[in-house]
Amino acid sequence: MDSEKSSDAAPAMAESIPREVFRVPAIGDVWVNGLSNEYDASTFPSQLEAYMTQADYDKALDTINQALHDLWPCVPCWSTSYGCCVCTLGLSLYCAWGQVSEAETCTARQIARVNRRACFKDRHITWRLEKSWLKHTSWLVISVVE
């Protein structure tokens, strides 16, 4: 009986795996951890035409980019953090680290709100932020469950 339950659950699990449709590249300033303060909203990718309208895409990206811009460190804080990095053995990076961390947290909240919008939720479209310390970059992933 247990084998019947596991075999029934397997197809349902396979169907609900999201498929990555598009990655929105970072175009703004990048912090040490790879987080960028802006993602490319200049063009609407043709891969997304079957899943969402350009207006929905633009509004979602504006929301995400605005969250990053609002909390991103100011130029003096940013400059001091990087400029004094060698002299302070990296300790100056903590000046802006709190702001970057808060920007990332706020952006995660905004992405959760974007995912709850009817235009995305009803179509099983999800947005998520991914970053790579190794590659020193980040991107937004748009996935869909078909």
What residue ranges belong to the model's regions?
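A composition-biased, non-transmembrane "mature-region" signal
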Residues: M1-E146
